[in-house]
Amino acid sequence: MTELSAHLPQFQHGQMTENFPDNHLSNTNDNSERRRHDNSERRRNDNPGSETNGQPQNNIQQVVDQDEEEDEELTLKYGAKHVIMLFVPVTLCMVVVVATIKSVSFYTRKDGQLIYTPFTEETDTIGQRALNSILNAAIMISVIIVMTILLVVLYKYRCYKVIHGWLIISSLLLLFFFSFIYLGEVFKTYNVAMDYITVALIIWNFGVVGMICIHWKGPLRLQQAYLIMISALMALVFIKYLPEWTAWLILAVISVYDLVAVLCPKGPLRMLVETAQERNETLFPALIYSSTMVWLVNMAEEDPEGQRKASKNSTYDKQAPANQSQNEDAEADDGGFSQEWQQQRDNRIGPIESTPESRAAVQALPSNSQTSEDPEERGVKLGLGDFIFYSVLVGKASATASGDWNTTLACFVAILIGLCLTLLLLAIFKKALPALPISITFGLVFYFATDNLVQPFMDQLAFHQFYI
């Protein structure tokens, strides 16, 4: 911009004039300069579209083409790259759940139900079972809706400390209590003898490191691993304590609710995302899995505006002595731009004079000085609830399909296909989209189709020893 402004003509009273350094030149020289200037103006008038703001249009077109190519490269890079970076954690979460369901009988044994599903499905008639499952699903979805609205209201009114405490308590339960139960059942299944002191040390280290990585700072891979683990633990709890028909109904209804909550103008999840974007804040890492690092430090401040102003003032105070020292250094070391160099430049192109018109013209030029998004902030973000319900679907399919791997793999592939289509729509519409509807719909269709059509067909083929 500095080099470009040196060649900008001055616009005064609607006429284009230039200042030349030699005021002692004769009238003949002045006339010759005027003639050359008039000839240059005629050439510009003959080619009116040749220059714009001192830049040829060909160069501008090249810059636009380069920007478009860079945008396409970024779309491909941060599109396909982050699709793969989301496939891996979703796959890992579902693999952990399925492996646990297949090996640890504790999570397939019916020992009770959640308090949110009070109606039992152990009934004499199918109609009564269907009614009880509908009531259980309605209560569960109502609890989810109320909790979501409460979270949005707290975030809307900047109750960050309340939300943070809520999430910390939830993380403590998952990382310590449910992890202790999970580890104990795994040791029982594989007949591993372990004393309580060693188990306590393992759980303590696991939980403390997880709390630090999730709610403060930690390596990206470690944070992602903990988010995957707590999602798998929560999914295992749902798989164990949700009745079969209730679980399928909840999955169907939660996908519809996710669609409404994200896409409706007054949907709670949409309001949450829009509020975070308006405040230029990241959502809590305990709620969101990101393919890039998300740290949460100093969000729970009572007056973020005042904090921002104070930080700006402190920045200016710190920059003032630095600028003074830089000026002193510039006087001692001119970096090659000495007085002789400036005089030679003035002799070649004339003195550079700044006027309000020239400054306005320079400021009107396109600038690339806008703050670009930090590479760490790029990436696709997926809610932990999506991980949980994906894993619940695959885990329930694995637990209730009589040990059939075909149904489990069909649901697994269906969820990944739905996630891929969701990310494709995300790249097209470039706004927050629900991740559950497509994947859950495909998963439910594949589950019932495979369990009721494909598996009996394959059993008959195996019975009659037919090979296709």
UniProtKB/Swiss-Prot annotation:
Stretches with biased composition (Polar residues): 12-30, 48-60, 312-327
Record topology, Lumenal segments: 105-133, 191-195, 243-249, 403-408, 455-468
Localisation per UniProt entry: Endoplasmic reticulum membrane; Golgi apparatus membrane; Cytoplasmic granule; Cell membrane
Keyword line: Apoptosis, Cell adhesion, Cell membrane, Cell projection, Endoplasmic reticulum, Golgi apparatus, Hydrolase, Membrane, Notch signaling pathway, Phosphoprotein, Protease, Synapse, Transmembrane, Transmembrane helix
Enzyme Commission number, as recorded: 3.4.23.-
Major place of residence: endoplasmic reticulum
InterPro entries, sorted: Pept_A22A_PS1 (IPR002031), Peptidase_A22A (IPR001108), Preselin/SPP (IPR006639), Presenilin_C (IPR042524)
PTMs per UniProt: Heterogeneous proteolytic processing generates N-terminal (NTF) and C-terminal (CTF) fragments of approximately 35 and 20 kDa, respectively. During apoptosis, the C-terminal fragment (CTF) is further cleaved by a caspase.
One GO BP annotation of this record: regulation of phosphorylation
Bias (Basic and acidic residues) ranges: 31-46
Entry remark concerning the domains of this protein: The PAL motif is required for normal active site conformation. Substrates, such as NOTCH1 and APP peptides, are bound between PSEN1 transmembrane domains and via the first lumenal loop and the cytoplasmic loop between the sixth and seventh transmembrane domains. Substrate binding causes a conformation change and formation of an intermolecular antiparallel beta-sheet between PSEN1 and its substrates.
Family from the record: Belongs to the peptidase A22A family.
Function: Catalytic subunit of the gamma-secretase complex, an endoprotease complex that catalyzes the intramembrane cleavage of integral membrane proteins such as Notch receptors and APP (amyloid-beta precursor protein). Requires the presence of the other members of the gamma-secretase complex for protease activity. Plays a role in Notch and Wnt signaling cascades and regulation of downstream processes via its role in processing key regulatory proteins.
Identification of the protein by name: Presenilin-1
Source organism (scientific name): Gallus gallus (Chicken)
Lineage: Eukaryota, Metazoa, Chordata, Craniata, Vertebrata
